[in-house]
């Protein structure tokens, strides 16, 4: 890819589990955007060198590889515990992948990967208001001594109550305001039945 002139800030690579230290340094130097898909990686590909990639100064975000059952909360947990087991235990380093680092990968890292880190990925003046609200008044979240750690370790997609995209509320109190969920489920079921009939 380097010889072809492809490595650069407009390249987004997924998984990144087979990279050598030289590859990591080169990709970081060229500004390549990288995404890890932890569940898919562990199921099929292997352990990514996430700590080394971050140490090299590369942009690293989280994805779910298109897997519908997954969500960003699951991906953060899987990567955290995989990194602790694979990279942390041998060196007796239980914080090889910290919760603030994972939250940044899930937010700013994803925005950077899309090439929109200047307008998305963090709550700052001048950036688009893309936010989710969590119900933290629940026994698996509260009380919390460190909310960032608790969100990464304990929160899940069911805790999301509201979603705001570019300042517009699209989900309020777990009700999607912009789509007909019942109709979508009905259509999905109908199409699935048609696919099954054709397959057998």
Which residues does each predicted region cover?
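Short, charged, surface-exposed secondary-structure boundary motifs
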Residues: 43-48, 71-74, 143
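Flexible loop residues that form catalytic
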Residues: 16-17, 84, 137, 168
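His/Asp/Glu-enriched, well-ordered alpha-helical/loop segment
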Residues: 4-6, 10, 51-138, 154-155
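Short, acidic/turn-prone active-site loops that include or flank metal/cofactor-
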Residues: 38-43, 65-68
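Active-site microenvironment of metallo-dependent hydrolases
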Residues: 104-200
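Residue-level signal for inorganic ion chemistry
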Residues: 13, 65, 167
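Conserved beta-strand positions
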Residues: 15, 36-37, 62, 134
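Histidine/acidic residue-rich metal-binding segments in metalloenzymes
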Residues: 1-33, 45-60, 118
């Amino acid at each position: 890819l380097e010889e072809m002139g492809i490595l650069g800030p407009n390249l987004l690579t997924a998984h990144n589990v087979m990279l050598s230290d030289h590859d990591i340094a080169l990709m970081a130097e060229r500004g390549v955007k990288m995404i890890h898909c932890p569940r898919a990686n562990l199921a099929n590909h292997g352990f990514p060198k996430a700590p080394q990639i971050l140490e090299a100064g590369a942009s690293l975000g989280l994805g779910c590889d298109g897997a519908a059952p997954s969500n960003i909360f699951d991906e953060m947990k899987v990567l955290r515990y995989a990194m602790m087991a694979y990279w942390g235990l041998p060196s007796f380093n239980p914080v090889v992948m910290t919760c603030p680092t994972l939250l940044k990968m899930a937010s700013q890292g994803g925005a950077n990967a899309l090439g929109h880190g200047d307008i998305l990925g963090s709550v700052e003046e001048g950036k688009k208001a893309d936010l989710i609200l969590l119900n933290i008044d629940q026994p698996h979240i509260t009380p919390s001594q460190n909310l960032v750690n608790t969100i990464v370790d304990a929160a899940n997609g069911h805790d999301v109550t509201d979603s705001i995209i570019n300042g517009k509320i699209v989900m309020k109190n777990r009700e999607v305001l912009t789509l007909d969920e019942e109709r979508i489920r009905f259509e999905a079921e109908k199409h699935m039945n048609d696919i099954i009939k054709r397959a057998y």
